[in-house]
Amino acid sequence: MAQLIIPPGALGGIDALSAATRMGLESVEHRIVKPPVAWAGTEAETLCDLAGLRAPMAFFHGTAREAAARFPLNANVALVVALAGLGPDRSRVTLVADPASAVNRHEITATGAFGSMVLRFENAPLRDDPKSSAMTALSLVRLIENAGASLVI
């Protein structure tokens, strides 16, 4: 049987979000906050003055599908959350440029019959690619290690 394995990338807790779907999810919201430099070269430049920001600016509110399509290098991780949760059209995403942020932050809130969960990750951006973080690469390393491991956590 063929199997497509989607790594969690910069995030953790995706297994818990996926498990929560077994009882039914009501909402999944993913807020992605990055320094303005991480949004350079994207549509965000036409939605706000990235260089002139003095306070956090939420420049996008929409579905995970829309976020990933419009900001593929920054919000592709929103699809991971969506696929683990409510799907790309029911998962809500907010994208924020924050001049005071030195990290790429992901805040995921989910509610449902299981209760609620709040997941927050603050990943140091890669020096050569501020849109991404080392956690993304480490996630892939762990996936490869798990393929040959007798104990997988």
Predicted regions and their residues:
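Conserved PLP-enzyme active-site core in the AAT-like
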Residues: 1
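Active-site-lining helix/loop region of Rossmann-like oxidoreductase modules
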Residues: 4-5, 10-153
